[in-house]
Swiss-Prot record:
GO terms for cellular component: cytoplasm. It is found in: Cytoplasm. The gene is cheB2. Pfam families: CheB_methylest (PF01339), Response_reg (PF00072). PROSITE patterns: CHEB (PS50122), RESPONSE_REGULATORY (PS50110). Residues 5-122 form the Response regulatory domain. It comes from Saccharophagus degradans (strain 2-40 / ATCC 43961 / DSM 17024). This is Protein-glutamate methylesterase/protein-glutamine glutaminase 2. Phosphorylated by CheA. Phosphorylation of the N-terminal regulatory domain activates the methylesterase activity. GO terms for biological process: chemotaxis. One of its GO terms (molecular function) is phosphorelay response regulator activity. Belongs to the CheB family. Residues 157-348 form the CheB-type methylesterase domain.
Length: 348
């Protein structure tokens, strides 16, 4: 098999050199070029036909966001953003994902907590995943918002004790937005785990809240779970659901990583299965790996309705694909049908 051709776009010579060294350490990848600004990158894309790009957000002459807008319009390619994993960098990175970037990773730092060897493993994994991503699905995500659910939801009342849990990873920020922004005010309570860094979950929840009729929160420990509300797991804690005499509440757990993740979809789904039982619904959306697939099967076996996003509309059909292989999903649906299905099963 021919190696995946990677084009690095970064104005720092040091970062370009570090990335090149790490990427070329894996025989499945080959650095076909390194550009110091988007203008140079534009010419290199024409000449070298890379399979995937790494793109810095902050660059002179033209920033990464402007370049990404043009690229996705004229020559869509899988892109992994190299961004500052801070609250300051979060809005720009989330915007890059909304414009069609597949994934993001922090900048390599020689003295970071995440050692360079761990960073190398992560960027290699993300580049290989991005190279196989469904770029045409990216174009459809923004159009996946469902309409007309208000009238349906207003005509009936919600089932008592019903709760929906959603899990996602790569491509998930936009897939979750497509689902949540389609929901009417009369929606069931929804809990969400998206693999995201700690500094990003607050921005993600705010961004979703601004785009939706329902109220979206970054989940707090012991926060009551109410209808018409969506609760997003913080980037450094597992989100669990607990049943109390007054109703469901959110619990946050900073314990060990599960399936290499904290928050983990598996942890959320298992707690929902245990606490909500057959009144729950489980939804697994686009994402790399298999986090949540086995727990979704346990939810289905316990009598919950379960959904996996279909391959055609998934950026990466890892997690939903794993769920389908395990027969964990009662239905496999395109992204634009998920919100309506949640409402259908939530109403009496």
């Amino acid at each position: 098999m021919k190696p995946i051709k990677v084009l690095i776009i970064d104005d720092s010579a040091l970062i370009r050199s570090l990335l090149r060294e790490m990427i070329t350490s894996d025989p499945r990848l080959e650095v076909c070029g390194a550009a110091e600004d988007p203008y140079q990158a534009r010419e290199m894309i024409k000449q070298l036909n890379p399979h995937v790009l790494t793109l810095d957000i902050e660059m002179p002459r033209m920033n990464g966001i402007s370049f990404l807008k043009n690229l996705m319009r004229l020559h869509p390619l899988p892109v992994v953003m190299i961004s500052t994993l801070t609250q300051v960098g979060a809005p720009e990175t989330l915007e890059a994902l909304s414009l069609g970037a597949v994934d993001f990773i922090g900048k390599p730092k020689q003295h970071s907590d995440l050692g360079l060897s761990q960073y190398r493993d992560e960027i290699i994994r993300k580049l290989i995943c991005a190279a196989g991503a469904n770029v045409t699905a990216m174009e459809g995500v923004g159009k996946a918002k469902a309409t007309g659910l208000d009238a349906v939801a207003q005509s009936k009342s919600l089932k008592t004790g019903f709760l929906c849990a959603i899990g996602a990873s790569t491509g998930g920020t936009e897939a979750i937005k497509a689902v949540v922004s389609s929901l009417p005010l009369n929606s069931p309570p929804i809990v969400v785990t998206q693999h995201i860094p700690p500094a990003f979950s607050t921005s993600f929840a705010k961004r979703l809240d601004g785009a939706s009729a329902v109220k979206v929160y970054e989940a707090q420990h012991q926060q009551p779970i109410e209808k018409g509300c969506v609760y997003i797991a913080p980037g450094d804690a597992h989100l669990k659901v607990s049943k109390t005499a007054k109703g469901y509440i959110c619990l946050l757990d900073s314990g060990e990583m599960v399936n290499r993740h904290r928050p983990s979809v598996e942890v959320l789904f298992d707690s929902v299965c245990e606490q909500v039982g057959n009144k729950a619904m489980g939804v697994i959306l686009t994402g790399m790996g298999a986090d949540g697939a086995e727990a979704l099967k346990r939810m289905r076996d316990a009598g919950s309705h379960t959904i996996a996003q279909d391959e055609a509309t998934s950026i990466v059909w890892g997690m939903p694909g794993a769920a389908v292989k395990l027969d964990a999903a009662a239905e496999v649906l395109p992204l634009n049908k998920v919100a309506a299905n949640i409402i259908k099963h939530a109403l009496k």
